[in-house]
Amino acid sequence: VQTVTEECVRLLDRVRRELELSEEQFEVVDYKECFCFYHCNQEEKLQNHQAGLFDGSSEKIVYYSLEKEKRTKPCVVTIKEQKLGILTDDKDAGFLAMAQQAFDKQLVSTVYFVGSAFDGGWMQESLKYICRGRRAFLGKNLYSLGACFVAFQKKETEREYVYLGDSEFKMNISLKVRKKQELEFYSLVTAGENWYLKEHSCEVILDGTDTVELWLQHPYGREAKIESLELADLPKRPVRTTRIRITVHLLGDTKADIEIEDLGFGELFPSSEKVWKYTMEF
């Protein structure tokens, strides 16, 4: 879709349920995210500097500027949107002015064109300017191909890059857990996930503590902040006999509700049915 909104996601989610598709088989992405995944899967020589996309799918020309923060791992990708206006009767001269405005003080090495506005072979002087030191590509299926890359690569546990747009969550949330005597991080939420209608949950056994520590890390940084959530009035039980469920409800790109539920430990220690709720804004 052109723009992801909560209303749009709710509507398409109803369609998903009607088609009996699982949440893993379903993803709503906007044009900018499709552009990101399409460009980032092109050959390396096109990745030197910024990439630009002129969208002529509607009456108004829109320009998307893609930039990578290569010092982070994974690489963080952001896209800025600029509305350039309507083409005049002299399309070539009008579009030349738009391109000069879009490229002002920017180092752009790759440019894409999509949409019927660029049909007809009218780009002459504007195209000469755009291709001066830049590679340019014209096509109609960039968004659909980008969506295919999204579907394929979001299944991967380790990614080379993460896209942070308006509808993507901006923080990594993890737990430090012990698994087979080894300490490791369990990812509850990964930065770059679409936050609409999303929740994540897991069950863990407490090891002699009445607090839950969430590790928060911004994708731009290396250091993590630890947020300690106290489980007030948690029933006293022997070590490792308290199982809890942690659920994260995403409320926005920087906001989440955390719900922690006491599950007890089977018939030996029944659940107290206590629930602790926290709201976190980053």
PLM regions and their residue ranges:
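Glycine-rich phosphate-binding/hydrolytic loop that grips phosphoryl groups
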Residues: 29-43, 136-178
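A short acidic Gly-Thr/Ser loop motif
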Residues: 45-62, 67-68, 115-118, 164-170, ...
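Glycine-rich phosphate-binding loops at beta-strand->alpha-helix junctions
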Residues: 1-7, 101-128, 139
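Structural alpha-beta junctions
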Residues: 17-29, 105-108, 125-142, 147
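Short glycine-rich, Thr/Ser-proximal phosphate-binding strand/loop in the N-terminal lobe
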Residues: 63-93, 268-282
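Phosphate/ATP-binding catalytic cores across multiple sugar-kinase/actin-like superfamilies
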Residues: 35-42, 90-107
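Nucleotide/phosphate-binding catalytic cleft detector across ATP-hydrolyzing
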Residues: 1-51, 180-250, 259-282
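A short acidic (Asp/Glu
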Residues: 7-12, 38-41, 61-66, 119-126
